[in-house]
């Protein structure tokens, strides 16, 4: 180790010495290496300056290549899913476009009517989720229309005339009628530049011609469409009418109106670039009722003839408004209501006004104020006040909801549900479909799950069926029929009430009130969406009174007579007489309506459609009525009563019990009263007998035993007094009578109690030793000096005698039955004595007697055994014969009788001594 350190020191010293050449070599090498590095750095900087554009291009190419590889790495399954989503989107667009003709059209696009779609979502006019979904769908359709119309736009530079044809809506009150639509063209010196349309252009146009609220004194002046010019072709000019007025259901128009320049206001006109060539087909499809029940048909005619022919379709919108609801002003206004006659005043449909509102408010967009809508509804309801004595005309919505394919409703529901779930999640769990509590007077806001049970029974006008029909359409069930209320081209329309619980459950949860007047063929009906008609119908349409509910007397309780005692139950014959009302069907008042209740839902059927009930059904209904009356009388349902009768029958009435014991005839159930089987009847009678026996014997045994410890025994005192009166010569007679009483009472007592008492007494184990100890004992000892004997010996002897008698009498079940108190008094003697001895801290007499009997068994002669056998045989013979005489008890010796007498006297003196102390 030391050698290595010396070598290192010498090497470092030579390297660091100034005379060494190693340091010179290192300095030269360092300078050369630094110069080379500097040159390399300069070369690198020059190269980077020249190669930076190339590297950037390479980087972009690399990124593009990565993107291409990512796109190529998409699996076939992802492509299939993307294609499926695109196909679903196309189907949805086509389905939404097929809902109805556009409200207004322009050469560049169409604004489709989403009102029907909005009504299909939910009937709540202020539902935020549904309004947003409708607005999104409307924007989507607007974009699609703009995309479809973009290729068809041609530049105006190629036009020869150099003038633009624009359409204005104007009116001259002095020259033409208010509803004439004059088509005019204004030449321009130069064509305007092409206009890039915004997606909200169609909505703006709809808002321009929206009807003013009912509370506004003056409607807004319509804006000419010249403010937003459209580059259009100079091919045949097209009309551009807008729904300036709500459509009117007109039977007759004033003859002063010229048909050449008049435009029928029964519908919302739609003119599109793709739907303007079916004029001949539209003419062929018209029928006699097309003017009143037909749908809007897009058609285009030359400018000089503005008469529009309507055709028939599945989706129609027919609305009526009175003259006072016209949107035009009195002077110089471009829109005013036509003079109409024969307006249908049969029924109010105030909620239909909300269906015109989406055209003006962008399908219930977010800027729509619910309070304004409610004020309009209330204003429309008060017809006499706001309309100057004119009743509100019908707002007829004949809708025949039919879908092209079964997949379309599911697709629509799935798309809307996604949007609804997202909006609900965004609103942090707020309930969609929240609505003011009081929409109008006497209106109750109920949930859809409580509608069937509460409101439907209350109004008797409800029937529910699902929103999406199984076969792609709703099967309208005609429920309520009324007499004809109006004439429309001499056709009587039937009014029917239907309650529809429809709408997507994720979009709204409250049941709302909108009313729809739907036409199906030649008949029409009022459809109450998640709501029931109330008393406002009777105020608004006196022609259509609300149907009177008919109630079956199924749950009307019969009051019990108050003169009956509390625990007394009615006899079955009395129950039958109370429970048999007259047949409910003849008692109903004459009415054309026929009511049927099904699970708490009452609905009315026309009399001709209601099937007649079979006799079995009538019997079943009568039996249900009787059963309900029985439940009201007895206070418990029949099922509970049967179960209680089987397991725990009620205590019978004491009055009925006494009567039954006097008559000695069991009460039988009449088979005609209740349909009971023979087994159930037998069980019922058996339980009744058992309860009567228990009621006869009074309180249970344990209660009597506890009461016997608190009060002295009267019967024992009476026996002791009789013994003292008659003297010692009658002891045998008294004892024989007492034993006879014990035997008779024991035979009448239930056997189970005898078994328990015999088991209790057999614990003393004195069966064979009693006779021995008593026969061998000196007879004169107790006769001459009974007071000198100890109380314990007397008690033990009396206990053994009593035990012998009880064991002898336990097997004898025959005999005359007497009262229970005598047996209880005899038995409580033993129990009270035991309790007293235990309480006083003395040794029980049974233990002392057992010791005494053991001592006496040592000196037992053989004669005693023979006497015991003879006595046992006599007891068996007496048990076999079962004769209730005192001679059978003669096997008791005088010694035993004296012991019993002494015991009774001492037991009788104890309570007296205790009281004196």
Curated annotation (Swiss-Prot):
Locate the transmembrane regions by residue number.
29-49
Question: Where are the residues of the annotated region Disordered?
Answer: 55-80, 152-195, 773-798
UniProt subcellular location: Membrane
How does the protein associate with the membrane? Single-pass membrane protein
- NAD listed as a keyword: no
Gene Ontology process terms (BP): cell differentiation; spermatogenesis
Upper classification of the source organism reads: Eukaryota, Metazoa, Chordata, Craniata, Vertebrata
Start-end of Basic and acidic residues biased regions: 782-798
List the protein's name.
Answer: Spermatogenesis-associated protein 31D4
Outline what the protein does: May play a role in spermatogenesis.
* Biased composition annotated in UniProt, kind: Basic residues: 63-74
What does the entry list under GO cellular component?
membrane
Superkingdom, natural source: Eukaryota
Family membership, please give it. Answer: Belongs to the SPATA31 family.
PANTHER family according to UniProt: ACROSOME-SPECIFIC PROTEIN, SPERMATOGENESIS-ASSOCIATED PROTEIN 31D3-RELATED
- The main place the protein resides is membrane
Q: Name one Pfam family in it.
A: DUF4599
Low complexity: bias regions:
152-163
**Which InterPro entries does the UniProt record give?**
SPATA31, SPATA31F3-like
Please give the organism.
Homo sapiens
Q: Which regions are flagged for Polar residues bias? A: 164-177
């Amino acid at each position: 180790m030391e050698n290595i350190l010396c070598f290192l020191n010498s090497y470092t010293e030579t390297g660091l010495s100034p005379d060494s050449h190693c340091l010179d070599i290192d300095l030269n090498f360092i300078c050369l290496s630094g110069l080379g590095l500097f040159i390399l750095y300069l070369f690198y900087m020059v190269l980077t300056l020249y190669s930076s554009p190339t590297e950037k291009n390479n980087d972009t190419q690399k990124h593009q290549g990565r993107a291409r590889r990512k796109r190529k790495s998409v699996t076939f399954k992802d492509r299939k899913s993307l294609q499926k989503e695109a196909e679903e989107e196309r189907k949805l667009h086509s389905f939404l476009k097929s809902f109805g003709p556009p409200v207004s059209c322009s050469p560049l696009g169409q604004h489709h009517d989403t009102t029907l779609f909005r009504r299909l979502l939910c009937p709540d006019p202020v539902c935020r989720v549904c309004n947003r979904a409708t607005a999104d769908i409307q924007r989507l359709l607007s974009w699609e229309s703009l995309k479809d119309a973009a290729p068809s736009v041609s530049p105006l530079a190629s036009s020869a005339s150099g003038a633009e044809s624009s359409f204005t809506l104007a009116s001259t009150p002095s020259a033409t009628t208010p509803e004439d639509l004059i088509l005019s063209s204004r030449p321009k010196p130069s064509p305007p530049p092409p206009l890039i349309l915004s997606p909200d252009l169609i909505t703006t146009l709809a808002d321009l011609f929206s009807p003013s609220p009912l509370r506004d004194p003056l409607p807004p002046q319509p804006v000419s469409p010249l403010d937003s010019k459209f580059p259009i072709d100079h091919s045949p000019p097209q009309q551009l009418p807008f729904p300036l007025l709500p459509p009117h259901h007109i039977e007759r128009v004033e003859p002063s109106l010229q048909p050449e320049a008049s435009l029928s206001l029964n519908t919302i006109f739609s003119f599109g670039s793709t739907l303007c060539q079916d004029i001949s087909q539209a003419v062929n499809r018209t029928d006699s009722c097309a003017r009143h029940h037909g749908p809007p048909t897009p058609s285009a005619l030359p400018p000089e003839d503005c008469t529009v022919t309507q055709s028939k379709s599945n989706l129609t919108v027919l609305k009526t408004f009175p003259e006072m609801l016209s949107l035009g002003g009195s002077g110089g206004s471009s829109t005013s209501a036509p003079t109409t006659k024969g307006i249908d005043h049969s029924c109010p449909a105030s909620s239909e006004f909300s269906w015109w509102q989406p055209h003006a408010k962008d399908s219930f967009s977010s800027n729509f104020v619910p309070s304004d809508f409610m004020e309009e509804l209330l204003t429309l309801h008060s017809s006499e006040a706001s309309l100057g004595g004119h009743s509100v005309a019908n707002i007829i919505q004949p809708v025949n909801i039919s879908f092209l394919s079964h997949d379309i409703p599911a697709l629509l529901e799935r798309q809307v549900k996604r949007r609804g779930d997202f909006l609900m999640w965004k609103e942090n769990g707020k309930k969609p479909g929240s609505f003011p509590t009081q929409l109008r007077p006497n209106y109750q806001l109920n949930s859809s799950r409580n509608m069937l049970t509460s409101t439907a029974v209350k109004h008797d006008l409800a029937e529910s069926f699902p929103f999406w029909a199984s076969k792609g359409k709703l099967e309208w069930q005609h429920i309520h029929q009324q007499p004809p209320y109006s004439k429309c081209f001499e056709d009587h329309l039937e009014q029917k009430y239907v309650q529809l619980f429809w709408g997507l459950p994720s979009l709204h949860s409250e049941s709302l009130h909108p009313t729809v007047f739907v036409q199906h063929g030649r008949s029409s009906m009022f459809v109450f969406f998640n709501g029931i008609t109330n008393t406002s119908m009777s105020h608004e349409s006196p022609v259509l009174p609300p149907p009177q509910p008919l109630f079956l007397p199924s749950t009307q309780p019969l009051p019990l007579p108050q003169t009956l005692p509390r625990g007394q139950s009615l006899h079955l014959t009395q129950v039958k007489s109370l429970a048999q009302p007259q047949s409910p069907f003849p008692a109903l008042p004459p009415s054309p309506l026929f009511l049927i209740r099904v699970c708490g839902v009452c609905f009315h059927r026309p009399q001709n459609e209601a099937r007649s009930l079979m006799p079995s059904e009538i019997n079943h209904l009568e039996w249900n009525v009787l059963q309900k009356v029985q439940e009201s009388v007895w206070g418990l349902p029949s099922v509970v009563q049967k179960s209680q009768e089987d397991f725990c029958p009620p205590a019978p009435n004491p009055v009925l019990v006494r009567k039954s014991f006097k008559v000695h005839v069991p009460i039988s159930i009449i088979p005609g009263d209740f349909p009971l089987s023979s087994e159930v009847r037998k069980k019922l009678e058996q339980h009744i007998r058992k309860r009567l026996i228990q009621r006869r014997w009074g309180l249970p045994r344990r209660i009597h035993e506890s009461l016997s410890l608190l009060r002295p025994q009267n019967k024992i005192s009476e026996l002791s007094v009789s013994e003292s009166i008659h003297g010692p010569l009658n002891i045998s007679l008294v004892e024989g009578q007492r034993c006879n009483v014990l035997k008779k009472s024991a035979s009448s007592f239930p056997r189970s109690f005898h078994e328990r008492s015999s088991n209790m007494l057999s614990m003393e184990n004195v069966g064979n030793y009693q006779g021995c100890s008593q026969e061998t004992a000196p007879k004169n000892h107790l006769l001459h000096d009974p007071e000198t004997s100890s109380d314990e010996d007397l008690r033990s002897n009396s206990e053994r005698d009593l035990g012998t008698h009880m064991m002898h009498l336990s097997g004898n079940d025959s005999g005359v039955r007497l009262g229970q108190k005598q047996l209880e008094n005899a038995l409580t003697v033993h129990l009270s004595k035991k309790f007293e001895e235990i309480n006083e801290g003395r040794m029980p007499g049974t233990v002392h007697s057992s010791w005494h009997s053991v001592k006496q068994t040592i000196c037992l002669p053989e004669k005693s055994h023979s006497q015991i056998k003879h006595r046992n045989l006599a007891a068996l013979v007496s048990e076999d014969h079962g004769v209730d005489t005192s001679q059978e008890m003669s096997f008791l010796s005088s010694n035993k009788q004296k012991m019993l007498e002494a015991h009774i006297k001492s037991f009788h003196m104890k309570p007296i001594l205790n009281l004196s102390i």
